[in-house]
A protein has these predicted regions:
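Catalytic core of DAGKc-family lipid kinases
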Residues: 47, 83-214
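Glycine-rich phosphate/pyrophosphate-binding beta-alpha loops
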Residues: 156, 160, 217-231, 298
Length: 320
């Protein structure tokens, strides 16, 4: 196996990730690349605000590789920036997870990064990774035009989205991270805000169906919430979206054990749960302000259309 050559590389690091530890990790990464010559030339830029990583990735012309150093949020921004570039010149993506979720990194096989050992970068290979495209409409914007956003791992609507979005404030209060944080947020959301979400759904152009969903997850990778295996068989390189949704009305007493069983992917055979695969999905929401998340970031919409862009992004993946 040949040693990895990232070529000219841009490192985009969120210095606030992992309670500020990511800044030190970025400096160690610089020294590692310098000593091992894994990149012919590299530049390090620290993000300064929300959306900055997207801007930097969009402007990363002339680079072969962009390394996203941070959690799922900074990776999501970097992916959205890279997807604005023409495919012929679009840099490849590498990730070093320094966050609280890290589902995308786990899908790539990077699940034990400590911030000190960069061994995952020593022997990597390029693979073509699917990307999800979201077209969303928000009447409050007044434009009537769709907003386009991309995601690399997870899109969901309903109680699971509320759980994911609720982890931000809960992390500040508790200091928890990863699956324990997501589980605690789940117990909180089920206790305070549990409900069914009426919506109309259509997959691959089939006739629309009205459902009362408690969750609607449209996945590229198998997990969300730091390891919850919501779509256990999802493959981010197969050109297909994997969908898990639970239709109600589902009583809270049934839904909570179902949520907990999803940690190990044991929910898929339960009666309220439906599993399917598609390339295109359309969701129209009957009420405003449904919780919607893409890679843990909020989406505001009354209607969304989702497509899979097969093999749209080259991604460096550690070889086993």
């Amino acid at each position: 196996m040949h040693a990895t050559d990232f070529g000219r590389t841009l490192i985009i690091a969120n210095p606030a990730a992992q309670s500020g530890a990511a800044h030190e990790v970025a400096e160690r990464l610089q020294r590692f690349l310098d000593m091992t010559a894994r990149a012919s030339q590299f530049d390090l830029v620290l993000t300064e605000r929300m959306g900055h990583a997207k801007e930097l990735a969009a402007q990363a012309t002339g680079y072969r590789t962009v390394i996203a150093l941070g959690g799922d949020g900074v990776i999501h921004e970097v992916v959205n920036g890279l997807m604005t570039q023409d495919e012929a010149v679009r840099p490849a993506l590498a990730v070093l997870p320094v966050g609280s979720g890290n589902d995308f990194a786990q899908t790539l096989g990077i699940d034990d990064f400590s911030g000190k050992d960069f061994g995952a970068l020593l022997t990597c290979e390029l693979q073509r990774q699917d990307i999800g495209r979201i077209r969303s409409w928000n009447p409050a914007s007044g434009s009537g035009e769709a907003t386009v956003e991309y995601y690399d791992q997870t899109l969901s609507v309903g109680i699971d989205a509320a759980i994911g979005l609720g982890t931000t404030e809960l992390r500040k209060k508790t200091g928890l991270a990863g699956a324990p944080l997501y589980t605690l947020s789940g117990l909180e959301q089920f206790g305070l805000r549990y409900r069914n979400y009426p919506m109309t759904v259509s997959f691959d152009g089939a006739p629309a169906e009205r459902v009362r969903a408690i969750i609607m997850a449209i996945q590229l990778g198998p997990t969300y919430g730091s390891g919850y295996r919501i779509c256990p068989d999802a493959d981010p390189c197969d050109g297909i979206l994997d969908v898990c949704y639970a239709c109600g009305p589902v009583p809270r007493a049934v839904a909570l054990p179902m949520f907990l069983s999803a940690k190990d992917g044991h929910h898929t055979k339960l009666p309220p749960v439906r599993m399917r695969r598609c390339r295109h999905a359309e969701l129209t929401f009957e009420e405003p302000d449904y919780p919607i998340q893409a890679d843990g970031e909020p989406v505001v919409a009354s209607r969304i259309e989702v497509d899979v862009l097969g093999g749209a992004l080259h991604v460096w993946r550690p070889t086993r």
